[in-house]
Design a protein with these regions (language model features):
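Post-transcriptional modification and biogenesis factors for structured RNAs
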Residues: 1-141
């Protein structure tokens, strides 16, 4: 398995420790499958959510992040606390990092401090569309 680090340069020691521990309980084939899955994970893109009122929607987002290999999910809890619904996340919350932030400003400052560009959805016509957004320009949230 490669060093668990992605193109944005963020090491993932917690995940490496989990896999090392679990490797003693699985076959070599299963271990190889797990290593391939980890090698495909990324921190180059991360997902943020803010004051999620419906925990089932936020919990579904956790599952989507895990399914698409997004290693981090950020939750702003200024008005609503985020607690994953175990019936919806189905254990996927154990494989991604959920980072909680008290305010949107703190989240943005933290991500920018780590070199992320901040991207948001907006109904404005003059902004970039997904087709014109430069994914290769650096990590984004």
């Amino acid at each position: 398995m490669k060093n668990i680090e992605d193109s944005a340069g963020f090491p993932d020691e917690l995940l490496a420790r989990r896999i090392e521990y679990l490797s003693g309980f699985m076959t070599a084939e299963r271990y190889a499958t797990l290593c391939r899955a980890v090698d495909m994970r990324t921190r180059y893109m991360t997902v943020c959510m803010e004051n999620t009122f419906h925990p089932q929607n936020a919990s579904a987002l956790v599952r989507n992040c895990e399914a698409f290999g997004v290693q981090e999910l950020h939750a702003v809890e200024e008005l609503c606390r985020f607690s994953p619904n175990v019936q919806i996340v189905r254990g996927t919350d154990k494989w991604i990092e959920i980072r909680k932030h008290p305010t949107t400003a703190e989240l943005i400052g933290s991500l920018r401090g780590r070199g992320y560009r901040i991207v948001a959805t907006t109904p404005h016509l003059d902004d970039a569309t997904p087709e014109t957004f430069d994914v290769a320009a650096g990590p984004f949230a």
